[in-house]
Regions:
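Bacterial N-terminal signal peptides that target proteins for export
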Residues: 1-11
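Hydrophobic helical h-region of N-terminal Sec-dependent signal peptides
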Residues: 9-21
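Beta-alpha junction/loop-to-helix N-cap segments that form part of ligand/metal-binding clefts
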Residues: 28-30, 43-53, 57, 61-136, ...
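Venus flytrap/periplasmic-binding-protein-like
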Residues: 78, 124-125, 130-134, 211, ...
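Extracellular/periplasmic Venus flytrap/periplasmic-binding protein
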Residues: 84-87, 132, 140-250, 287-294
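Periplasmic-binding protein-like
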Residues: 92-106, 124-126, 174-179, 205, ...
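Extracellular/periplasmic periplasmic-binding protein-like sensory domains
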Residues: 139, 246-326, 405-409, 413, ...
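Segments of small-molecule ligand-sensing domains
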Residues: 307-319, 330-403, 437-438
Length: 438
């Protein structure tokens, strides 16, 4: 009898243990992080993922999670390499309660499109990614939030037009695009050619092989070309090397326009005085003046839980972009919980939250992020969210905003995006959605 009693006790204990495990999993929303903290792009990786993790820590510590659901995460080092990124995906994809993937890598994002679609888990590519994934009718689970490569290009050309006296004054001008030799760098080749034809300027596109620590021949070519402006589509070490090499060849820094991955403190400080006057596009502001950043300092860093090793990087461009990425992920979860309940959500439910993600100035202020970014208005068929951009100029010690928020030319861009996305749908035999319920 004692044996049977003990067996029953053990069975009850095992059942309780399983129930406890299920409850623990039910109270967890998991983020698998394909981060990169070593290699030539470590500055971007440590800053962005540091900010992302800092915001998740803030929400857990200050708010007890989202609707009582704790936010958890695990990092996998990719070194910004596609193969490693896919390996991390395969290793972590079975973890319960995955909210979304956030690789911050165009190459990894491309490799995951079919995988996340099959697994029904969102993939967020803030400020980057495949341009036509903006069309949510075709790419149900991919979200190039705030800015895609084509809208970035439109913003840059609009800014240059303003500097030369208007769009009609672009005719006859020469623009060189110096781009990183990767899928990310090559993404905008077609749109620059299209805009050159539209406005009548000449464009010359020059590749810099990865990682970009030698550019002498490219800048000699630029010197011979004598362009009016150079657009720098760099990443990591390529950016300060470009600015220093430009100075050596006599090209003025204030006629170099950096893209969204050439706009951080880590891009200009190593270049020294060669960066003074340099201009770059941005979708997120730098600085620690924002209440959400101050909350992170007080709640996370003062408690010894901050993710950045160097506290001087708090509030820098990459760090603030990571914080903003955290805000967008968490808000999508909050919105989805309002519909599906305060519990662990499925990836598909988080996708619904993302397709209803709307943050105006009032909501941004409530989140402590007023002025950190402009706004976002995602819908089931527009996965970018009508992001706006601004331009900033480096004065040798800090970035100064030199423009208002600028909206891309959506009337021009949307038909181009849809043509590409519908061709992809035909190739992959994807049924084009007609509503959020599809």
């Amino acid at each position: 009898m004692s044996f049977i009693k003990n067996l029953r006790t053990a069975a009850i204990a095992a059942t309780l243990a399983i129930s406890s495990l299920q409850a623990a999993q039910a109270d967890e929303q998991f983020f698998p992080l394909q981060s990169y903290r070593v290699g030539p792009y470590a500055a971007g990786g440590t800053g962005f993922f540091g900010g992302f993790i800092d915001y998740l820590n803030l929400v857990n510590t200050r708010d007890g999670g989202v609707g009582g659901v704790k936010l958890t995460w695990e990092e996998g080092e990719t070194q910004y390499e596609v193969e490693r990124g896919v390996e991390v995906y395969e290793r972590l994809k079975t973890h319960p309660g995955i909210a979304a993937w956030n690789p911050l890598s165009v190459g990894i994002a491309y490799a995951l499109i079919d995988r996340v679609t099959a697994d029904k888990v969102p993939l967020l590519t803030i400020n980057h990614g495949r341009t036509d994934t903006t069309d949510g009718r075709v790419f149900k689970y991919i979200f190039p939030l705030l800015l895609n490569p084509y809208s970035e290009t439109s913003g840059i050309v609009n800014y240059i037009a303003g500097k030369v006296g208007g769009e009609d004054k672009l005719k006859g001008k020469k623009i060189v695009v110096l781009y990183h030799g990767s899928p990310y760098g090559k993404e905008t080749i077609p749109i620059y050619e299209l805009l050159a034809k539209k406005y009548g300027f000449t464009v010359q596109q020059i590749e810099v092989p990865h990682p970009g620590n030698e550019q002498q021949s490219q800048w000699l070519t630029i010197r011979r070309a004598k362009p009016d402006y150079v657009v720098l589509r760099g990443w990591g070490v390529m950016n300060p090397v470009a600015l220093k090499t430009a100075q050596k060849t006599g090209f003025p820094a204030d006629h170099i326009i950096g893209n969204v991955w050439s706009n951080s403190e880590e891009d200009v400080i190593p270049a020294g005085d060669a960066a003074k006057g340099y201009v770059a596009i941005t979708s997120v502001a730098a600085g620690t003046q924002f209440p959400v950043v101050q909350d992170i300092v007080k709640t996370v860093y003062d408690a010894g839980k901050g993710n950045l090793e160097d506290k001087k990087r708090i509030g820098t461009r990459y760090h603030n972009l990571g914080i903003l990425n955290g805000i967008l992920n968490v808000e999508a979860i909050r919105i989805a919980q309002a519909k599906f309940g305060k519990r662990t959500l499925t990836g598909d439910e988080v996708r619904w939250g993302l397709e209803n993600l709307k943050i105006d100035e009032a909501r941004a202020a409530a989140l402590g992020a007023k002025g950190l970014f402009h706004s976002i208005n995602v819908s089931w068929d527009n996965h970018e969210g009508d992001g706006s951009v601004a331009f900033q100029q480096w004065d040798g010690s800090k970035w100064n905003v030199v423009s208002d928020w600028i909206a891309p030319d959506w009337k021009l861009l949307r038909p181009i995006i849809e043509k590409s996305s519908l061709a992809y749908a035909k190739e992959k035999n994807i049924k084009v959605r007609t509503s959020i319920n599809d």
